[in-house]
Structure formats: C-alpha cells, structure tokens
C-alpha cells in the first residue's frame, strides 16, 4: 500500500475544521453528535482523508457509546494500531494505514465473532451507500 503524505497546509485545505481536528490532531467528536453514529444504511465507510475503504455496514452495530462502532474492519491491514497513553489512560488508537489519519480507538468489549469494538469518529469517515450515493459530513 502506497502511503499518502501531505503537508499540514494541504490537509487543512482539503478537510473541514472538524475533520482536521479529529484526523490530523487526534481529536474526538462529542458522543451522539457525529453524522454516522446511528446510520443503518448498507454501504462502505472510507477514510475522509484518502478515500481508503475501511469498514462496512455489515460489521457495524449499535454499541450505545455514541460513535460509529464496528466489530471488525474490512481488512486488518487497512488499520494501524498504536498505544495511546493520553488522558491518563492506556488505550489502543486506530489510524488509517494509508494516510495515518486518526480514526478513534479499539476496545475489547465488542460482540462476537471478534469481541472488539472499533469506536470511530464520524468526522474521520465518508459513507458510500450500497446504492452509490456518497454522504459527507460537510454536505
């Protein structure tokens, strides 16, 4: 996979302020405020920064946490995991492997078959419905 590298200025021009804050600044949107936390349409969720397909609606579930939650990514190689020790906690941060965009965190409290909960910020995603329509947070 070829990495996408852009300058800070290029990312700022491409992304909304909220998308930049979340994906490039490792921010977190408030729960129950993101566009996709309760989306139930069939489709694919791609990285808002580089367009890499990351998650499918088939793996999405309602965890009750207020963020889009998935029990698995489309392909584990599309997600990079790093230890995050911010906010006096130890968590596992998830990033897009192609462009290093911060997506959210993964927790070991999800449903079977993986037991994992990929808790993802809506601002880091763009949704492509199965019928071909793309929905973006800044529309």
Swiss-Prot record:
Q: Which SUPFAM superfamilies match?
A: Mss4-like
Q: Which residues form the active site?
A: 119 (nucleophile)
Organism per entry? Hahella chejuensis (strain KCTC 2396)
Span of domain MsrB: 8-130
Reactions catalysed: L-methionyl-[protein] + [thioredoxin]-disulfide + H2O = L-methionyl-(R)-S-oxide-[protein] + [thioredoxin]-dithiol
Gene Ontology MF: a single term: peptide-methionine (R)-S-oxide reductase activity
Name the InterPro entries for this protein. Answer: Met_Sox_Rdtase_MsrB (IPR028427), Met_Sox_Rdtase_MsrB_dom (IPR002579), Mss4-like_sf (IPR011057)
Q: Which PANTHER family match?
A: METHIONINE SULFOXIDE REDUCTASE, METHIONINE-R-SULFOXIDE REDUCTASE B1
Q: What does the record's cofactor remark say about binding?
A: Binds 1 zinc ion per subunit. The zinc ion is important for the structural integrity of the protein.
Q: Which gene encodes it?
A: msrB
Tell me the superkingdom of the source: Bacteria
GO cellular-component term (any): cytoplasm
Similarity-based family: Belongs to the MsrB Met sulfoxide reductase family.
Q: What is this protein called?
A: Peptide methionine sulfoxide reductase MsrB
Q: Where does Zn(2+) bind?
A: 47, 50, 96, 99
Return one Gene Ontology term, BP aspect: response to oxidative stress
């Amino acid at each position: 996979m070829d990495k996408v590298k852009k300058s800070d200025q290029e990312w700022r021009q491409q992304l909304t302020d909220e998308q930049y804050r979340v994906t490039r600044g490792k921010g977190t949107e408030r729960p129950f405020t993101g566009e996709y936390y309760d989306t139930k349409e069939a489709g694919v969720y791609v990285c808002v920064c580089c367009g890499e397909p990351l998650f499918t609606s088939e793996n999405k579930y309602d965890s009750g946490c207020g963020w889009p939650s998935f029990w698995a990514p489309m392909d584990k190689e599309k997600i990079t995991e790093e230890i995050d020790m911010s906010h006096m906690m130890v968590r596992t941060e998830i990033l897009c492997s192609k462009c290093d965009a911060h997506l959210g965190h993964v927790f070991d409290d999800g449903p079977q078959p993986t037991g994992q909960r990929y808790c993802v910020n809506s601002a880091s995603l763009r949704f492509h419905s199965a019928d071909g329509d793309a929905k973006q947070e800044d529309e």
